[in-house]
Design a protein with these regions (language model features):
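Short secondary-structure junctions
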Residues: 2-5, 48-53, 99-101, 144-147, ...
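Intrinsically disordered, low-complexity segments enriched in serine/proline and basic residues
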Residues: 3-12, 22, 26-32, 36, ...
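Glycine/acidic-rich beta-strand-loop module
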Residues: 8-12, 18, 104-108, 113
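Solvent-exposed loop and beta-edge segments used for protein-protein assembly and interaction
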Residues: 17-19, 51, 98, 112-114
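Short, hydrophobic beta-strand segments
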Residues: 19-26, 60-63, 116-123, 150-152
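An extended, acidic, His-containing surface patch that forms the Zn2+-binding/catalytic region
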Residues: 31, 58-104, 110-113, 127-132, ...
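A common structural junction motif
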Residues: 38-49, 139-146
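C-terminal, non-catalytic macromolecule-binding modules
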Residues: 119-145
Length: 174
């Protein structure tokens, strides 16, 4: 059956890991969509248990008969972006075991009248790694016909093996 995506929304902060998302789908076969959602929920609960035991996928029928939807080409570009974009931990610190050095997350995804916007929080304690990760996002976005705007840039805060401030803070903390 054919289906179209009319809108989607994730969390409201680009530097937070989303805990929910919604999507409006135009669907000709509601029972098939409900079966698919139930199957995905079962699989994802199995894969993410015990971290996400309450993971839920809900299908709620909407009686809206007319709405704007993404073209097939646009939907394919969005899907390609979501499947190919880096997400999560990209590198761990070589200086401090267990410390994330470079990471990013897709915090906000919205569909407007003429654009799909994805907002990422890109972080790294190494400036060059953060720049490289931002460049990866830029290249992928441009290859898919999109544009990139960088804002809210947090500077890298590199680990220093010799840090008088850290030594003082450790003394004060004790």
């Amino acid at each position: 059956s054919s289906a179209g995506r009319s809108s989607q929304r994730s969390c409201s902060k680009d530097n937070a890991i989303p805990n929910e998302a919604t999507a409006q789908l135009l669907c000709e076969d509601l029972p098939a969509l409900e079966r698919l959602a139930a199957a995905w929920q079962s699989q994802l609960r199995h894969e993410y248990a015990p971290a996400e035991p309450d993971l839920t996928i809900t299908v709620t029928p909407n009686e809206k008969t007319a709405c704007a939807v993404l073209t097939e080409e646009s939907a394919e570009r969005v899907l390609c972006m979501l499947l190919c974009v880096p997400n999560g931990i990209q590198a761990m610190s070589g200086s401090l075991p267990g410390l994330v050095q470079t990471s990013l997350n897709l915090g906000i995804l919205t569909t407007g009248d003429d654009a799909v916007e994805l907002h990422f929080g890109v972080r790294s304690s190494v400036a060059s790694q953060k720049e490289m990760l931002t460049e990866r996002l830029t290249v992928l976005t441009h290859q898919l016909g999109g544009t990139v705007e960088v804002f809210g840039d947090y500077p890298a805060w590199e680990y220093r093996a010799e840090s008088p401030l850290r030594e003082l803070m450790c003394e004060v903390y004790r």
